[in-house]
């Protein structure tokens, strides 16, 4: 799951032509936090994951590769 998160963040950030610093500013965190997440050293909190997903224009499920199954 973490590997998918790091890859998705990097790909989506590149797609939007954002630097780590720009992503961090828009999400309200430090560039160091974004770097730690992309390096796989940190898993974001729920709130941060929601903010990152919004800035990156993806769903949280897409960030974490969560498959939703119908009941």
Language-model region placement:
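DNA major-groove recognition helix of helix-turn-helix/homeodomain DNA-binding modules
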Residues: 28, 47-62
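Alpha-helical residues within the helix-turn-helix
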Residues: 14, 25, 54
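Short alpha-helical DNA-recognition segment
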Residues: 17-36
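Key DNA-contact positions within bacterial/archaeal DNA-binding proteins
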Residues: 32, 42, 61
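Residue-level detection of the helix-turn-helix DNA-binding "recognition helix"
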Residues: 14, 28, 39, 68
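A short, Lys/Arg-rich alpha-helix, primarily the initiator
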Residues: 1-15
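Short, charged recognition helix plus adjacent turn
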Residues: 54, 64-71
